Amino acid sequence: SGWDRQRIVDALIRETEVDVVTAQEISREVEELISSSNISMATSPLIRELVDAKLIERGLEQARKRHTRLGMPLYDVDQLILHPNKENANVPHGPEATNLTLAERIKKEYALLSIFSEEVADAHMRGDIHLHDLGFIDRPYCSGQSLEYIKRFGLSLPNSIAMAKPAKHAEVLLAHMVKFAAALQSHFAGAIGWDAVNLFFAPYLVGMRDEEVKQLAQMMIFEFSQQAVARGGQAIFTDLNLYWEIPRHFEDVPAIGPMGEYTGKTYSHYEHEAQRFAWFLFEVYREGDGSGRPFFFPKPLVHITEKFFRTRGHREFLHHICEVASQKGNTYFVFDRGETAKISECCRLSFKLDASDLEDAQQPWKMRYCALQNVTLNLPRIGYLSGGDNRSLFERVEEFMDMGVRAHLEKKAFIEKLLSYGENGPLALLAMKRDGSSYLRMHRASYLIGMVGLNELVQIQTGKQMSESQEAFKFGLKVIAHMKLLTDRLSESHGMHFVLEQTPAESTAYRFAKLDLEYHWQKAHHVVKGDIPRGEVYYTNSTYLNNGAVMNPIERVRLEGLFHPLIEAGSLTHIWLGEAKPSKESLANFVIKTFKQTQNDQIAFSPEFTTCNRCHRTSRGLTEICGYCGSRDVDGITRITGYFTRISSWNKGKIGELHDRYRNQGFLRVAGKEEKYEGKMVMLISA
């Protein structure tokens, strides 16, 4: 529409609030520069860059920031479209995935320039802390909810072109659940967790034959597994919380059945139907998909409680889910000891229920929880900066945590602003009030403070890793206990629920290690794990012991479990099985021992598989050649953090960790009632 210098003036005044005289001077200088350069076509991006240069010349850095154009270089976009993004192994490669990544890149820049303060943004950029899911700055992290919400209110979503009344049949309830999960996935950055799924389906299963219940179980698992058409081509990161018994807090709760109506009974009357559904879900998991591969999603989390062991059929069910754990690795064992009750999701996150939550259990549709954001601290960085001085170390822990809290306050303010627009705003789904209060209950939100590299921090301070000496291990406990004390103090002072979390750190452990090798090479190269020449570097995740430490698996579970009472937002210990396929009896004994003799919150047994892209068959263990057809066109499958995925999608840091993992080959074999460990034990700590 022709050149008009006034547009530059208007944009500068509107966006940067510089005075009119300065804006006019800059517009004239840019016009002269374009005229003298013989540029045939002055595009908007070019003009904006020239204006930014003039702002920098005048020392107007804040104005330059506000005037910045967000985007990506042409070369980066070209690479992005041609090559897969390995930052998240759950994102496939395709047009929808590149759309997601492009949008994420812009929102990341927006978050760091506009939402977070310069101090917080700088702390993230230099690697003191990590702000997770910056590309999803306009949504909370993850959520836990109840099927009772859609059973009671149907599928009535803001901006939807059709409204569905409460389901009459189990298949329709499942369809509502999947659709609602997809809608929630587009409003949360992380996992979508569902509480007591088998129990809340139970009133719909009365009178159904076993074949019909199994078909429903099959539909559920395949529907969630094949939803790789949702956000960015991703499968919905779904967690199903399952119980063999009726949880105490749901025993006397009136049951909601077809059409959203009360059945006249409490949930304690539906134990048999709930157990049938749980049993058949694990039958489907045991069979695997059409190629015999384990299902990546939805993830089944079985709660093991005191009541579990008093419930009829628990031994058979425990053997059943342990057989699935051995053959396919799907089962997560969540330990709710004493009076504890929680909803678990997202690799290891859990929402522990307090007295007010248990009151909400009388109306389970109110039981909706979210973690608003996850901020992770680079613990080895604290070690490098402290120079071996313990007092300095604990002071820096406090400084880093204060920066994390500041990031949470800034994200909270932004989300509250978006929610203030209600059902006409960008977070309409989370602002909807079907039961009189917003779907996202901000007063119940948690704010996560995670950690990476405790093992390396301890190594820097004591000269030993946590698996190498009792003194080193106890120092690690002291650091986390100090962080727990700080989160409690910060929660009280800010009136917010700050909690420690074991960050999954799929890419963060790699990012921190790379940055520290760049900025603190002299110290970092002694403690960073992996293969430095190949760039396959990482820090030990959260509070874990070294992945490669050779030790009895029950001792690893016991020692790592000593941290778990301090980490309110959830913890997990992996037992890497490799090719081993232990008996269901030995795994069941292991689970019982973990429940009764340790403080561990959650465990998962993780086997490894090779899947062939030619003959589509799957075999145990990681191999370079298909054992069936001899093809080299194969891919490995195992857990990257808290979920299964193809190894070809992993980043370099996770590849380095995979090489180092100590597999418990031979694991445990039952001899009478005793377990015999066949591996080599390096050390046992009495802690």
Predicted stretch roles:
Residues 4, 8, 193, 447-454, ...:
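Catalytic-loop motifs flanking and including active-site residues across diverse enzymes
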Residues 1-85, 89, 659-663:
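Charged, amphipathic alpha-helical regulatory modules used
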Residues 81-443, 464-465, 469-627, 631:
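Conserved catalytic cores of very large enzyme subunits
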Residues 610-629, 642-687:
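Intrinsic, low-complexity terminal and presequence regions
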Residues 214, 221, 460, 654, ...:
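Metallocofactor- and cofactor-centric catalytic cores in central/energy metabolism, strongly enriched
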Residues 199, 242, 447-460, 481, ...:
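Contiguous, well-ordered alpha-helical segments that form the cores/surfaces of helical PPI scaffolds
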Residues 439, 443-450, 654-655:
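Core of folded catalytic or high-affinity ligand/protein-binding domains
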Residues 630-636, 640:
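Short Cys/His-rich micro-motifs in 6-15 aa windows
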